[in-house]
Amino acid sequence: MSNTRKILITSALPYANGPIHLGHLVEYIQTDIWARFQKMRGHECYYVCADDAHGTPIMLRAQAEGIDPEDLIARISEEHQTDFAGFNINFDFYHSTNSPENKHFASYIYTQLKEQNHISRKTIKQFYDPEKKMFLPDRFIKGTCPKCKTDDQYGDNCEACGATYSPTDLLNPKSAVSGATPIEKETDHLFFELSHFEDMLKEWTHQGHLQTQIANKLDEWFESGLRAWDISRDAPYFGFEIPGEKDKFFYVWLDAPVGYMASFKALCDKTGLDFDEFWKADSTTELYHFIGKDIIYFHALFWPAMLSGAGFRTPNAIFSHGFLTVDGQKMSKSRGTFIMAKTYLDHLNPEYLRYYFAAKLNSRIDDIDLSLEDFAQRVNSDLVGKVVNIASRCAGFVSKKFDGKLSQAWSDSASTLYQSFIDKSETIANLYEQREYAQAMREIMALADKANEYIDETAPWVLAKQEGKEAELYESVSLGINLFRVLITYLAPVIPTTAEKAQAFLQVDTLNWTDINTPLKDHEITKFKALMTRVEIESIEKMTDASKQDMKKMPPMKPEIKEEASNLDPIADEITFDDFAKVDFRIAKIVNAEQVPEADKLIKLTLDIGVGERQVFAGIKSAYKPEDLVGKLTVMVANLKPRKMRFGLSEGMVLAAGPGGKDLFLLNPDDGAQPGMRVK
């Protein structure tokens, strides 16, 4: 086609330290649908990805398993690619950041930035594990928060009060690797001076390359000033040594996005594609990154600046998506909703999930929810009950009554109905293009309803029993099969395996937007075989049960401080009843909850305690969405001295259990409790 586009698409690189789960698959399914759609439209499109295979966690896990990091990442890569293939994620090339191509481009970009004085050297103080003889990343240090005195907090921020700080500010710090008390040591680190690119980034972020919500968030970061980015790590470290340096390695987040270039370069070397055509500064090709909203800082600031500084093109757009919840809550190991890709594939058809995600996804960064009950109902209703049902209702008559051949002649009304389906093609194509998949699915299902209404009205099962109705029957079932062909073509980016089966049934060479303009007339089809079966609730239950068992078998995903006995907090020192009686616990109703933009972990709560309202800042953002909290009852400390924070005055504290992060659980009183009641 004359307006053929050249498009390169990437997904964020999965970390080579664990298995793929359904939360990961939101992104890969979203991207794969878009790539398949572009190819169906006749564009020259390439979809590449790779394992993110460097960093301290990989080094430590390999040590724990007694193997080399290279062996670990090779095994994980094979597991990842098996999972992706199971869900029909069709990469044109899948690579690793631990590759010669990635080493070349990471070193080249660094050298270009250094020659232009965008790299600086600074002496910093860092915690050092004297037992392991290694500098400790922030997340590998735990201790007591210097602000709220909560124990077992990470080295960069407190999940209880939301405070951010330097690891050296922690009280009673411990190495999460060995449990030893770390010592402070000076070390030289290399920094990328991001502020040198502030003007360029301010312009780039407001040229339509980002979603509006993301661009607005970046404005907040611009207001607070762009800080230099530490791009080096000290040995021992699994990664690439920095050119011209001894025992200094590229931080994993420097070479991770470079993996997009490396994977495409490997594809170019394999197929003869021109790498420079897609990556040179004045390239007219298109480059798109699909990522989660949690890594936007690296992709929308550091990455464009690195590319620009090194003389490469910047992305046409970065598409961010939200997170996945299951049954309205975070994925849970105890409930069996933290579901691994392999576990899902052991029990359910991957096309079910591809369709369900498509029916939920749009171009915004909102989180999406996998309601397991709705999942079964929607797949059974839409795919099985509407789309596949059209073919099964008509195909038998074509085979038995008309030797498997579709009719040659159509009435004007039949042609008009068919054309109404074709007239929707550009609307649906535009929705795919804009990543408004949910709306596209609604448009397609509205057409499916229309097709089923036609079959109901013409009632071929009745016509088949009446003499002299052969022509009407022939048109009814032939048009029904043609309408099915249009629908399955529109759905092909979402359910490719089902589309392939339908293609074989229809005996057509391709399914694409152009071919459906011409209906199948006087065309032979094969005998119909079931294209998809219903979702059974029993299969879902078996999957969640298996997921609970999976969690018991899995090694820890994050390092924990070694403890002699238990991971539970020890029982605190004994107090008297009089001490306890001083604390005034009250039932509180959450009447409002909102984000605190300046804080990573805090939610601002307005609490009704019966005798008035209180404002409390709670460090529960990692575990709850504000809109899910409104109307809930909880327990608060009502007589805690108000504490002035930079976000406002906190007039108490709500009670929650759990170690922190996603594992936080607000206390909820039993039914009958009322705001203001004292807990005693």
Curated annotation (Swiss-Prot):
It catalyses: tRNA(Met) + L-methionine + ATP = L-methionyl-tRNA(Met) + AMP + diphosphate. Its cofactor is Zn(2+). Its EC number is 6.1.1.10. A motif ('KMSKS' region) lies at residues 330-334. GO terms for molecular function: ATP binding; metal ion binding; methionine-tRNA ligase activity; tRNA binding. Keywords: Aminoacyl-tRNA synthetase, ATP-binding, Cytoplasm, Ligase, Metal-binding, Nucleotide-binding, Protein biosynthesis, RNA-binding, tRNA-binding, Zinc. It comes from the Bacteria. This is Methionine--tRNA ligase. It comes from Hydrogenovibrio crunogenus (strain DSM 25203 / XCL-2). The gene is metG.
